[in-house]
Amino acid sequence: MILAREAGYRIEQEDVETHLFIPESFFKGPLEDFWKALPSLDDGFEKRRQELEKEHKRLRFIATMEDGKCSVRLCEVNNNSPFYSLEGSNNIIMLTTARYHDYPMLIQGYGAGASVTAAGVFADIMSIANI
């Protein structure tokens, strides 16, 4: 959403198409029930991870924007994908354009992570307090 907005698109969270990988039933009822039920998915995800590993694939969250429409989903990526080696809070932005069609431009680096995000929030609080 941030990149879409920076590109000049007026987009809100409800405009982003999401593809759930958790059963819809998990979202019905209190949040406490969600957290209690979540571990029941662990074995299935681990089995899938092991199967993908044999095929030299991994699961990655990938968000896309095309023609002003945004979506986010859990995807299987091959070991030749730039997303394959992402770990921790690392991120990749891959720009596929008319000029960068066959070989998209990649921007890769650390995402915020918990400590950087906390430092940013603290800096914002201090900035507001000094106004």
For each feature predicted by the language model, list its residue ranges.
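Catalytic, metal-anchored helix/loop core of enzyme active sites in primary metabolism
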Residues: 64-131
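Substrate-binding/catalytic subdomain of NAD(P)-dependent oxidoreductase enzymes
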Residues: 1-85, 90
